[in-house]
Amino acid sequence: MAYYTPRELDLKVMKGFLCFPFLFLLLVAGPAWGAPVPEVGFLEPEPGFSELGAVADPMDLPKLERAALLASGLRPEELDPYQSRLDRIIVEAGAAAEQGPDATAKAESVLTFLHKNVLRSYREDATTIDGILDTGLYNCVSSAVLYMLAVRGIGIDVAGVRTSDHAFCTVLVGGRSVDVETTNPYGFDPGGKKEFKDSFGRLTGYAYVAPGGYGDRRAIGERELVGLILSNRASVLELSGRFAEATRLGADYAALCPGADSRAFQVDRINNLVASLEARRDFDGAVAAARAASAALPGEARLSALARTAAYNQAVALSQAGDWDAAFQAAARLAAASPEDAASAALVAGSLSGLAQSYGRKGDFAGARGAIAERADRAGPAAVAEARSVVGEMELVGAANGLPLAEAVAAADRILADGEISPARYAQAIEAIYGKEASRIGAGGDWLAAAAIADRGIAKLGVARLGGTDGSGDGSLARLAQTLRRNFVADAHNRFARFYNSGDYSGAKAALTSALASMPGDPTLTRDLAAAEAALSN
């Protein structure tokens, strides 16, 4: 007859701390790295932009020149020599235009003059006016701004046009609006010019948008055209990871060109700065930048949301680093500011549970409960209940797997009475505690003593049911007791067989009589006893 191996029950941890995901901040453009965030001044425009932004349209030509040079990155004290050079170009372009018979010819001659004498070579990132003056390198934005200034100098109405990837000018001459693709010497009224069509795309890499293609072109004023210098410079800075500097340009743009578009551009730059700081795991810097921006631009909903997201991610980072108290404090501030925010509430509960676990891992369950109690007012009832269940679970597992039987049962009873575990979990613990002890005794061969321990566990669960607690267990203790008794019967049968097979029928009968005294009525032992007695009677 074979033995049935008893199943040793082991109580495992069922509940662990939740892993909270970061709320990702999407970069509008550019890689996620850069220089450290400066002081709050990154939200302030450079001197001169606010003053120019307050000037009504149209600006006079000197102010427009000043705006273009400031947007190009020159400091106020650097402007005079560049403005003098710019004035000279405007005067010379005007002199060349005087030879034209009408406004159309004059406007075209200005473009011809600039390409012959100033604009040397196209380069995509050559977006500043001082860059043109110093090197002759230009792109669509800088050449359009220079043309705008020069044609304004001869009194012709001019405006800007922007598309998704390009900028140019229009002039009002001869009673009609004429496109001027300033990157190309043949760019005046370019639609029918073969020379323009052959060279434009090859030179710039962009597609010309004809006047009828209004879905991808938008008229902008002179001020907005100058603002594109700032926009381009910011994009270049972000591509090299210099997000704080790009954010300063966003402030300049918003000051120079007040309105929804420039404000959206500024907020995008702030978003990218915060996202880049988070990508470098500088969560303190990200929170500081987002909060400073939200305070400096009150009423901007995107910035309020950005500040909340940055603070949430800071709390998540603290929890991931195991700084549970700091994580809880940060999460509690968030939850207090946004009581209906489920993510913040979950983070409060998770960080409090994590703090409790940090005590529990050291076996300091009293300290864990004390830490929970100290923070109960800020955490709220749900978070407290969750954290206490974590502590109860940890203590229960430790007791079930490490304490003697009586102490382990007492701990389980207390944890259940404190409401830190459910009746079903209590039943699992009782089964594990009694099952482990029964298996330990059974391993020494005392099968019936082991079965008696299992029976005590079954009785314990029965008392729990009678007391109104639904903790009936899964029947594993009953199965274990049955296995242990089967092993007792197997042992007794094998002893009987040894006596019987050696012809010692008296010894066989004595062994069975003793076994039946412990398990009266067992059918296997009863049959064996009958066989021994039959052999003795022959």
Region locations from a protein language model:
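A structural boundary/capping signal
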Residues: 34-374, 385-397, 401-410, 417-439, ...
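Ala/Thr-enriched low-complexity intrinsically disordered regions
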Residues: 2-5, 469
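Long, intrinsically disordered low-complexity tandem-repeat regions enriched in serine/threonine/proline
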Residues: 458-461
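Bacterial N-terminal signal peptides that target proteins for export
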Residues: 7-21
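Bacterial N-terminal signal peptides
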Residues: 19-29
